[in-house]
């Protein structure tokens, strides 16, 4: 952990401990945390689109893990608000398991368009939900090609929790790494965000309240981080 300007920055290991405290000790379900994370992502997407998503095109890049599940929740909410949503399944639907797979079933039942990688994206906003804080090393295929395509598209990118390809603990960008205009990070920021090399990948950083218990914030000496709102701009 590092402490900067009244805010705790956690390593990937410490963030995992915070999640385990919420899930294993206090009984908050993975599904609840995923719902909250995706909802906050969708709320920030709406803000970035001028406060109105109806008729606007949003493409969500979805990986196999819980980060992808967060993206699927965000896709559902933007769709419900009238957005024109496309979900790109980076590794196919069969790669998703457990909570993300359940989210995908709901998305498909709602009639949200799901596609395989490839082709040209036409969107006002891309949502990067490919890799989460547990990822290490440079992304491999097929994710690497998706990341390069996203960066090359010139469509503004909102990263879910952290830009895919960025090491949460060290802040070392992989090859490739998403170049986001905005990042919605969940709970507390990661130590890697303090690395100057990481900051061009992160863009504007927002902290999103996903209902991690108060004990998490008290443990890291910043209990009031969301006292004035559930989406807080850090820089």
Regions found by a protein language model. Give the residues of each.
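Positively charged, low-complexity intrinsically disordered leader regions
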Residues: 1-56, 214-235
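YjeF_N-associated NAD(P)HX repair module
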Residues: 2-10, 125-235
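Generic, low-specificity signal for short hydrophobic/alpha-helical stretches with a mild N-terminal bias
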Residues: 4, 15-19, 23, 27, ...
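Generic structural signal for well-ordered, non-membrane alpha-helical segments
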Residues: 8-15, 27-38, 71, 96-103, ...
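Nucleotide and nucleotide-moiety/phosphate-recognizing core
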Residues: 43-130, 138-160
């Amino acid at each position: 952990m590092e402490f900067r300007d009244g805010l705790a920055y956690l390593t990937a290991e410490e963030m995992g401990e915070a999640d385990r405290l919420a899930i294993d000790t206090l009984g908050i379900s993975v599904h609840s945390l995923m719902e909250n994370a995706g909802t906050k992502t969708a709320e920030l997407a709406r803000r970035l689109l001028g406060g109105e998503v109806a008729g606007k095109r949003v493409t969500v890049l979805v990986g196999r893990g819980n980060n992808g599940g967060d993206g699927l929740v965000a896709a559902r909410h933007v769709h419900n608000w009238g957005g024109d949503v496309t979900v790109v399944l980076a590794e196919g639907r069969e790669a998703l398991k457990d909570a993300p797979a359940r989210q995908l079933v709901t998305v498909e039942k709602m009639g949200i368009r799901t596609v395989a990688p490839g082709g040209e994206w036409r969107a006002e906003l891309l949502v990067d939900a490919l890799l989460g804080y547990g990822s290490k090393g440079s992304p491999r295929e097929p994710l690497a090609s998706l990341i390069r395509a996203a960066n090359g598209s010139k469509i503004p990118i909102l990263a879910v929790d952290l830009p895919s390809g960025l090491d949460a603990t060290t802040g070392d960008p992989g090859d490739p790494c998403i170049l986001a205009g905005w990042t919605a990070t969940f709970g507390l920021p990661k130590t890697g965000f303090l690395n100057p090399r990481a900051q061009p990948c992160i863009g504007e950083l927002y902290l999103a309240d996903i209902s991690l218990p108060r004990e998490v914030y008290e443990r890291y000496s910043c209990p009031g981080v969301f006292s004035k709102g559930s989406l807080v701009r850090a820089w």
